[in-house]
Regions:
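Secretory targeting and sorting signals
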Residues: 1-11
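Gly/Ser/Thr/Pro-rich low-complexity, intrinsically disordered segments
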Residues: 11-413
């Protein structure tokens, strides 16, 4: 027997799938348009009832914000985060709930490293491995894809490029620029350098990070790179054209304009020679690669895997990126996800049964689809699968909290 659930937080009629019976245990409106629902479901092939905890909201609600949270101190050299219980988020104003983040690698007893990409406030904490992830957009929206960070490159004549070696400091390489982007800052051009002023604030919103890379279309030497842009194999690349409005020699003092950026480059190097040629050309602009289409407004990213539902179709076989234990958990375990319905609602969702039992990933994907998912991505499962709501005991598979490095949060303002 299938129970139809007629509320704004669930489909008016369940789609076909493995749920044989669905009952609402409780429902609470936590903020206007934001609903917490506890369901209990009987799923075919499983003897125990599955508890479903769901926080849903209307995508486009300007009061709602999704984000990545680091639960402890970040250690840049190792790219690790000190682990803490998800309840350590506390109860700051506006926090409505959270679920655990990406799979993570144990490095020490107190610090873990996220497996996938981790970005918060346009700062890259983990570059990840190029696998699935979700980018958080304004108004409770999100974009699921396979984001990666590629260096921002200034396109110079003769098919050469320059990278951004530093913000507010001199670059390390001759094929790099140092970007001074704080409006009103007075930059004194040091000996051996030249300055170029561009009429663009693009540098102020670039992804910032720290990675040593080689630029094969530059000097092809290992150098620290500080500025990046989102790339995604499923999204079109973009280019930005930045007008060059002035150049200044060593000894000059240049004020960073309100709508511009000052770039410093070593005299005689690839970057300086190329920018000088562009500045003297009939069309003094320099092109850079921007964020992939749909990613420019993404502030935070949380890695996850796999994409459980895509285009309204649940996955039907184990992807190569998912190991057999993650796929089955020995018969089933607790599982979290972020999902979007065809009716335009987003949900943080956690599903599991008593004593840590739960669903296989295949069944989980089918259940999400039956609950209306048009798109969904999973995060770390089993003992790490948790949901937290301020003022409530965390929902966990074993009755206690794991210590975790990251979480996805839902806030209301």
């Amino acid at each position: 027997m299938v129970f139809a659930v007629s509320t704004s937080s669930a489909p008016a009629k369940l789609l076909p799938g493995p749920i044989a019976r669905l009952r609402v245990v409780s429902r609470t409106t936590v903020r206007p348009g934001v609903i917490f629902t506890h369901y209990r479901a009987n799923v075919r092939g499983y003897s125990q009832a599955q508890e479903i905890y769901r926080i849903s909201w209307g995508i486009g609600n300007t009061h709602v914000t999704l984000g990545s949270a680091l639960l402890g101190t970040f250690h840049p050299a190792q790219e690790t985060v000190d682990v803490h219980p998800i309840s350590s988020l506390g109860a700051p104003a506006g926090l409505l709930g959270a679920i655990n983040g990406d799979y993570s690698a144990y490095t020490t007893r107190s610090a873990y490293r996220n497996s996938g990409m981790l970005v918060k406030g346009r700062r890259i904490y983990n570059f990840g491995w190029g696998g699935p992830g979700v980018g958080y957009l304004p108004a409770g929206d999100f974009k699921i894809g396979s984001p990666r960070a590629q260096p921002v490159k200034l396109k110079l004549p003769n098919r050469l490029t320059a990278t951004v070696g530093a913000f507010g400091a001199l670059p390390a390489g001759s094929d790099q620029v140092g970007a001074y982007d704080t409006a009103g800052t007075v930059v004194t051009v040091p000996a051996g350098y030249a300055a170029f002023t561009v009429n663009s604030t693009a540098f102020r919103t670039m992804l910032s990070g720290n990675r040593t890379l080689r630029n094969p279309t530059g000097s092809d030497r290992s150098e620290p790179v500080a500025a990046f842009a989102f790339a995604d194999p499923t999204s079109a690349a973009t280019t930005k054209s930045l007008p060059i409005v002035g150049s200044q020699p060593a000894g000059a003092q240049v004020t960073v304009p309100a709508t511009g950026t000052v770039l410093l480059a070593k005299v005689g190097g690839i970057a300086e020679v190329g920018l000088s040629a562009l500045a003297a050309s009939a069309k003094p602009v320099v092109d850079i690669n921007g964020d992939a289409k749909g990613w420019s407004s993404v502030s935070d990213v949380m890695g996850g895997k796999p994409e459980l539902v895509s285009g309204g179709v649940a996955i039907s076989s184990r992807p190569a990126i998912v190991d057999s234990w993650q796929w089955t958990c020995g018969g089933g375990c607790w599982r979290p996800a972020l999902m979007r319905t065809s009716s335009g609602r987003g949900s943080l969702i956690l599903i599991g049964a008593r004593s840590g039992s739960g669903l296989t990933m295949l069944s989980f994907a089918r259940v999400l689809r039956q609950l209306g998912a048009q798109q969904a991505i999973g995060f770390d499962n089993n003992g790490s699968a948790e949901m937290y709501r301020p003022g409530h005991r965390p929902y966990t598979g074993y009755g206690y909290e794991r210590w975790l490095p990251t979480a996805t949060t839902l806030r209301y303002r």
